[in-house]
């Protein structure tokens, strides 16, 4: 008898991706984050769908509609806090997933890596537009400041900003279009994630040793399907601890004040997951330069495959590059801290040093460390 999962056109696709997929026998918990990101995306799409049933994208009623969701809708407070903290969880998983890719040299799968970078940009755009929707003070001023950065683009800048705003300031038209984009983008992200997976399955997964694992493969199910279930359970436990006990820990208190164009908050800052990029933006005392640095802070990831000089793929047996990696991680924590501080000494100079270090490690120190390690292996 033929097994249905191996013959049915739809089941065959699922089978090749999640059941009979040959996987390396030694991939660690760091390889769980792909499935955890899928879980985060599902949580965000479902909670977002239910929120959109009660939300109104209008400047006069947006803030009240969010209050109505929290007060009057059955379990509305839960759905709202799941969605808000789900975004933070999404970025925690994203950054760990990218960190894993850098540490173990997964960026050598260029197509998978580049689609991952596109996915990161899409998720960042979605999160930014979602932050505008509750129409609190930080929503309004965050939208004003970040969209205004586009005016730094020579010649077309000011026209572009007015085109995005749909007027001469962030107003009803802006809120409306941001809601439309915020709704559609997660589905585009889901489609791109499938392409990401398609390219990954062309090459197969990398592993902690960074060596070919063709000689030692195991089926994805039951080994990694159960491992993913365990990872998902741990993620949900952590997620609901935050949602139910500390729902506002990661948010900004200013967003509980309705948007007021006549009153600027003392410190305009984005959500915590954008602070590192915001710090890099602010550390350059020139508008266009800052915008370029902001974009490059993410786009620099695309240079990882080009700047790989080592004869080994992963950092497992490369102590100098490992040191560089952990300095980079520490540097990102410093940038995140600086992004949340006011623009005054000593924070300005700390941010500038951390920004220079960020680009130096990736573009200069990593390649040099790789070459030194190659030499050391020959001694």
From Swiss-Prot:
InterPro entries attached to this UniProt entry: Cyt_b/b6_C, Cyt_b/b6_C_sf, Cyt_b/b6_N, Cytb/b6-like_sf, Cytochrome_b, Cytochrome_b_C_euk/bac, Cytochrome_b_N_euk/bac, Di-haem_cyt_TM
PANTHER family: CYTOCHROME B
One Pfam family it belongs to: Cytochrome_B
Note on how the cofactor is bound: Binds 2 heme b groups non-covalently.
Cofactor(s) essential for the protein: heme b
Residues bound to a ubiquinone: 201
Protein name (record): Cytochrome b
An example Gene Ontology CC term for this record: respiratory chain complex III
CDD domains in UniProt: cytochrome_b_C (cd00290), Cytochrome_b_N (cd00284)
Subunit structure as annotated in this protein's UniProt entry: The cytochrome bc1 complex contains 11 subunits: 3 respiratory subunits (MT-CYB, CYC1 and UQCRFS1), 2 core proteins (UQCRC1 and UQCRC2) and 6 low-molecular weight proteins (UQCRH/QCR6, UQCRB/QCR7, UQCRQ/QCR8, UQCR10/QCR9, UQCR11/QCR10 and a cleavage product of UQCRFS1). This cytochrome bc1 complex then forms a dimer.
Principal localisation: mitochondrion
Membrane protein topology class: Multi-pass membrane protein
Biological-process GO terms, alphabetical: mitochondrial electron transport, ubiquinol to cytochrome c
Spans traversing the lipid bilayer: 33-53, 77-98, 113-133, 178-198, 226-246, 288-308, 320-340, 347-367
Additional remark text: Heme 1 (or BL or b562) is low-potential and absorbs at about 562 nm, and heme 2 (or BH or b566) is high-potential and absorbs at about 566 nm.
This protein's encoding gene: MT-CYB
Binding site for heme b b566: 97, 196
Organism of this sequence: Perognathus inornatus
Cysteines joined through disulfide linkages: none
């Amino acid at each position: 008898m033929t097994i249905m999962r191996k013959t049915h056109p739809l089941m065959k696709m699922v089978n090749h991706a999640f059941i009979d997929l040959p996987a390396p026998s030694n991939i660690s918990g760091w390889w769980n984050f792909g499935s955890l990101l899928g879980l985060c995306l599902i949580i965000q799409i479902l909670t977002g769908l239910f929120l959109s049933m009660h939300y109104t994208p209008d400047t006069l009623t947006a803030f009240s509609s969010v209050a109505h969701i929290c007060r009057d809708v059955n379990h509305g407070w839960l759905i709202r806090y799941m969605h808000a903290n789900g975004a933070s969880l999404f970025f925690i998983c994203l950054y760990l997933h990218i960190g894993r890719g850098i540490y173990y040299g997964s960026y050598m799968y260029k197509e998978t890596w580049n689609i991952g970078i596109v996915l990161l940009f899409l998720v960042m755009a979605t999160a930014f537009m979602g932050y505008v929707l509750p129409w609190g003070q930080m929503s309004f001023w965050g939208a004003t400041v970040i969209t205004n950065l586009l005016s730094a683009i020579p010649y077309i800048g000011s026209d572009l900003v007015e085109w995005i705003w749909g007027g001469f300031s962030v107003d009803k038209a802006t809120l409306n279009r941001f809601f439309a984009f915020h709704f559609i983008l997660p589905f585009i992200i889901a489609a791109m994630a499938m392409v990401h997976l398609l390219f990954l399955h062309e090459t197969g997964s990398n592993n902690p040793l960074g060596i070919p694992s063709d000689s030692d493969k195991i089926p994805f199910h039951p080994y990694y399907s159960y491992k993913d279930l365990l990872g998902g359970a741990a993620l949900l436990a952590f997620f609901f601890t935050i949602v139910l006990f500390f729902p506002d820990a990661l948010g900004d208190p200013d967003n509980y004040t309705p948007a007021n164009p006549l009153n600027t908050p003392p410190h305009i800052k984005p959500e915590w997951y954008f602070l590192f990029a915001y710090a890099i933006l602010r550390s350059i005392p020139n508008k266009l330069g800052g915008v370029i640095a902001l974009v490059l802070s993410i786009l620099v990831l695309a240079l990882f495959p080009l700047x790989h000089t080592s004869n080994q793929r992963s950092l497992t047996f490369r102590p100098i590059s490992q040191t560089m990696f952990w300095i980079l991680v520490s540097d990102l924590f410093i940038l995140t801290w600086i992004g949340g501080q006011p623009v005054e000494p000593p924070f300005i100079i700390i941010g500038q040093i951390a920004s220079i270090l960020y680009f130096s490690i990736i573009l200069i120190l990593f390649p040099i460390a790789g070459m030194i390690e190659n030499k050391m292996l020959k001694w």
